Amino acid sequence: MRFAIVVTGPAYGTQQASSAFQFAQALIVEGHELSSVFFYRGGVYNANQLTSPASDEFDLVRGWQQLNAQHGVALNICVAAALRRGIVDETEAGRLGLASSNLQPGFTLSGLGALAEASLTCDRVVQF
């Protein structure tokens, strides 16, 4: 089966993102296809390159990045939600006159069209 995941919770502070990550790993282990993860609302904090968890905590931001690198899972973050929360790529940082960007490599600023496409092309869309 082909899946897409929607994450609406931040990397830390709620269970949503870590549950979504564990679900993503289980899908891959069981032989399903995970085509994309769409980060919306507070979920965009999962793409913040400046997140620095305690040394005894799992680094969820880098975990998502590894999922992208190892399995080719698209990591799309809602551009509108990201900009409102201070998550920008180099292009947006330049456009807004900001000194730097903080979008973790492997993540892509996307519109809701990416979520709509996933809804149309996947067998299941699961929201966390």
Swiss-Prot record:
Keywords: Cytoplasm, Transferase, tRNA processing
Subcellular location field: Cytoplasm
UniProt KW Protein biosynthesis keyword: no
InterPro entries documented for this protein: DsrEFH-like, Sulphur_relay_DsrE/F-like, Sulphur_relay_TusD/DsrE
The protein, known as: Sulfurtransferase TusD
Described purpose of this protein according to its UniProt entry: Part of a sulfur-relay system required for 2-thiolation of 5-methylaminomethyl-2-thiouridine (mnm(5)s(2)U) at tRNA wobble positions. Accepts sulfur from TusA and transfers it in turn to TusE.
Family the entry assigns: Belongs to the DsrE/TusD family.
UniProt gene name: tusD
GO molecular function: sulfur carrier activity; sulfurtransferase activity
HAMAP family reported for this sequence: Thiourid_synth_D
Claim: tRNA processing is one of the keywords in the record: yes
GO biological process per UniProt: tRNA wobble position uridine thiolation
Assembly with partners or alone: Heterohexamer, formed by a dimer of trimers. The hexameric TusBCD complex contains 2 copies each of TusB, TusC and TusD. The TusBCD complex interacts with TusE.
Main location: cytoplasm
GO cellular component entries: sulfurtransferase complex
NCBIfam families: PRK00207.1, sulf_tusD_dsrE
Any Pfam family matching the protein: DsrE
Active site annotation, chain numbering: C78 (cysteine persulfide intermediate)
Enzyme class, spelled out: transferase
EC number: 2.8.1.-
